[in-house]
Amino acid sequence: MTATLILLLLAQVSWAGPFQQRGLFDFMLEDEASGIGPDERAPELPDLDMLGPVCPFRCQCHLRVVQCSDLGLDKVPKDLPPDTTLLDLQNNKITEIKDGDFKNLKNLHALILVNNKISKISPGAFTPLVKLERLYLSKNHLKELPEKMPKSLQELRAHENEITKVRKSVFSGMNQMIVIELGTNPLKSSGIENGAFQGMKKLSYIRIADTNITTIPQGLPPSLTELHLDGNKITKIDASSLKGLNNLAKLGLSFNDISAVDNGSLANAPHLRELHLDNNKLIRVPGGLADHKYIQVVYLHNNNISVVGANDFCPPGYNTKKASYSGVSLFSNPVQYWEIQPSTFRCVYMRSAIQLGNYK
């Protein structure tokens, strides 16, 4: 009985037609003469839109970060994933940013365009970037800052360009801005419109170093805590230069041509803690240091200071309400250390914090 059943099963298998496994594109390999019957439909290709965003050719995409740096690109790639939050295009050969280059990138938070050849940015190029917080344009060929930057912007870095003008209109309504970097540009004082930075209520950090400005920009916002103007051609600090900077904590004026600091200048920055005036042309210690309550670090090395008075740094009858100095540099000045009275540094925290000598 069992043998009979097995024979019947084998007979059914031998009578059955050959099994054909059809793949997705097998219809392309069939005999063209057979065609498609009236009741048959060709297999449908998958909808590419259902597969999600596609990474631009040669770029790398991971966790909403699109990296297209160092690829020799001469324009912004097309069809960038709309969920991109960081786009890195640095070290390419892009010459122009056009309207539509960043369309649909409403979630972009950071845009890196450093070290390209950008000389032109269309007025509406950044309009779609409603959430952009960081814009890096350094090492390009821009002559002016772009118009209509996103109001959400918090950090702008555009050093090492060819910028000669900073218009007030560029920063109009930029109430979220915190950091601005404009160093190493052929910028002159006349090129900075008066009050260009004034309306930005959260602005905390400005760096305009290694340019051709001869004065401290006017109309700086009171929110500023750090101002770096090193390596310029500033000749003097007027009584009004720091007016209104009540929150300024760090002031960098190294490597300028400053020969005088007007009395009362430092009083306009009552919370100043660190002052860099090294590598200038000062002939005396700036007035007002002894009366300054919070200042702790003063760099005055490489100047022409020949005399240091007993009360230049500390008030008479030093009281503990003034913060102690943690650093005072006077080396590479004509004044000899033995000519300075020991009591001059009575409000310095440690003697090792005082740097003298080495003048040639």
UniProtKB/Swiss-Prot annotation:
State the signal peptide span: 1-16
Question: A GO molecular function for this record?
Answer: extracellular matrix binding
| Chief localisation class | secreted
Q: List the disulfide bonds.
A: C55-C61, C59-C68, C314-C347
Xref: PROSITE patterns: LRR (PS51450)
User: Is Glycoprotein one of the keywords?
Assistant: yes
Residues of this chain annotated as glycosylated in UniProt: S34, N212, N263, N304
Q: Note the pro-peptide positions.
A: 17-30
Tell me if Cell wall biogenesis/degradation is a UniProt keyword of this record: no
Top-rank taxon, per record: Eukaryota
Enumerate the UniProt keywords alphabetically.
Answer: Disulfide bond, Extracellular matrix, Glycoprotein, Leucine-rich repeat, Proteoglycan, Repeat, Secreted, Signal
Q: Where are the LRR repeats?
A: 74-94, 95-118, 119-142, 143-163, 164-187, 188-213, 214-234, 235-258, 259-282, 283-305, 306-335, 336-360
Give compartment(s).
Secreted, Extracellular space, Extracellular matrix; Secreted
Provide the record's note on post-translational modification. Answer: The attached glycosaminoglycan chain can be either chondroitin sulfate or dermatan sulfate depending upon the tissue of origin.
A Gene Ontology BP annotation from the UniProt entry: positive regulation of mitochondrial depolarization
CC per GO annotation: extracellular space
What role does this protein play?
Answer: May affect the rate of fibrils formation.
Similarity remark: Belongs to the small leucine-rich proteoglycan (SLRP) family. SLRP class I subfamily.
What does the record note on quaternary structure?
Binds to type I and type II collagen, fibronectin and TGF-beta. Forms a ternary complex with MFAP2 and ELN. Interacts with DPT.
- Protein name as annotated: Decorin
In which organism is this protein found? Oryctolagus cuniculus (Rabbit)
